[in-house]
A protein has these predicted regions:
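Catalytic cores of RNA-modifying enzymes
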Residues: 1-165, 196, 207, 216-219, ...
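C-terminal lobe and adjacent flexible extensions of AdoMet/dcAdoMet transferase-like proteins
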Residues: 167-233
Length: 233
């Protein structure tokens, strides 16, 4: 387990019974490790600050119904953690690691790519759980990286701006980018001009663009004043 490595562990658990039991279980099986464990009783999406020393890694069995929002939230509030392994439903694992051009590449793939590289590193059969679920699970390894470069430099855009454009680009997979972003740009003609200025084909679809391409589009829109931002990073 994590405590056996000598690491300090912060465990986030929404179930009060499990959260209360965990310290007792550790005290019974690894008495010397109790002081290195802190349990936070909370919905992970409500956590704003991780107590104690800044965490450097994430290891999680994510709730399958909210796996993507929880993962993105943890990446946002813990900019210092550099690596992680998460278990999610098999189909979600495929979407998280999907590459541009694939049928399952979408919002989760692009948003995760803003933060990190992700690869699928294993399968977990339902038979290892009790009770046995009717879904397969997958393990995804995440390695944080800097946001993608735009023309060899860091993009002059914020995460919130990028995510707004990602949401718009994938809202309708059949739409060309100029149509998908028309609402942000004041029309498809303006969108086409700005997308072209970014060096991207305005007739392309969002599913064909990697996060670097999308960041270039966002920068062009932001420079033209097409995106207002609250200052989030």
């Amino acid at each position: 387990g994590l405590l056996e490595t000598g690491a300090e562990v912060v465990a986030i658990e929404i179930d009060e019974v499990l959260a209360n039991q965990l310290p007792d279980t550790v005290a019974e099986r690894m008495p010397g490790a109790v002081e290195r464990l802190e349990v936070v009783l909370s919905d992970a999406l409500d956590v704003k600050v991780i107590p104690g020393a800044e965490p450097t890694a994430l290891v999680a069995n994510l709730p399958y119904n909210v796996a993507v929002p929880v993962l993105l939230h943890m990446l946002a509030i813990c900019p210092q953690w550099s690596t992680g392994v998460v278990m999610v439903q098999s189909e979600v694992a495929d979407r998280l690691v999907a590459a541009p051009g694939s049928k399952i590449y979408g919002v989760p793939s692009a948003k995760l790519a803003w933060y990190a590289e992700a690869i699928r590193v294993g399968n977990v059969p339902p038979t290892v759980f009790w009770p046995v679920p009717n879904v397969d699970s997958g393990l995804v390894r995440i390695t944080r990286r800097r946001p993608p470069h735009v023309d060899g430099r860091d993009p002059r855009v914020t995460r919130s701006q990028v995510f707004r454009v990602v949401d718009a680009a994938f809202a309708s997979r059949r739409k060309m980018l100029r149509s998908a972003l028309a609402g942000l740009c004041g029309g498809s003609m303006a969108a086409s001009e700005l997308i072209t200025a970014a060096g991207i084909d305005p007739t392309a679809r969002g599913e064909a663009l990697d996060i670097g391409d999308l960041a270039r589009v966002v920068e062009a829109l932001a420079q033209a004043g097409a995106l207002s931002d609250s200052g989030q990073v």
